[in-house]
Amino acid sequence: MAKVDTGKNFENEIRKSLKKINCFWFRIQDTNDVSRFVKQAIAEKQPADFMAVYKGVPILLECKTSKRETSFPLYYSRTRAIPKHQVEAAQKIEKNGGKAFFLLRKDKPRAKRVFAVSYQTIQKFYRGKRKSVKWEQIEKEGIELTA
């Protein structure tokens, strides 16, 4: 049985949603996709999955999924689930008048839910030195997106 890449599926769903909105957007190529053509050492880390402009406001979007039922992991072993360079890129966008959101999807088979969470909230989660965040807290601090 082939492994399903839920992250790529989520990105494709976001791509379809962006096509329905009257905005300019583009998909930022993943570093690992580029590294086939460029040496790994010089392939730059990408700031997010999508860049959009809506009503004149630049918007940075990064998609993350989790199959955990009770919480969203902030770390996988010792690696951050949301790398520092992505949080820093979100901060730069906001300092320059844009908006940045991390789209967190609870990947439960019959109850998929997506929340847009600001970079400030993500930073707060990491400053709390926790390994994960309860979905209830994400529900309170994020914006639930519907189809």
Q: Whereabouts are the PLM-identified features?
A:
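Acidic-basic catalytic patches of nuclease active cores, encompassing PD-(D/E)XK
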Residues: 1-43
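Nucleic-acid nuclease catalytic cores
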Residues: 88-122
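Short, solvent-exposed loop/turn segments at secondary-structure junctions
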Residues: 33-36, 68-72, 110
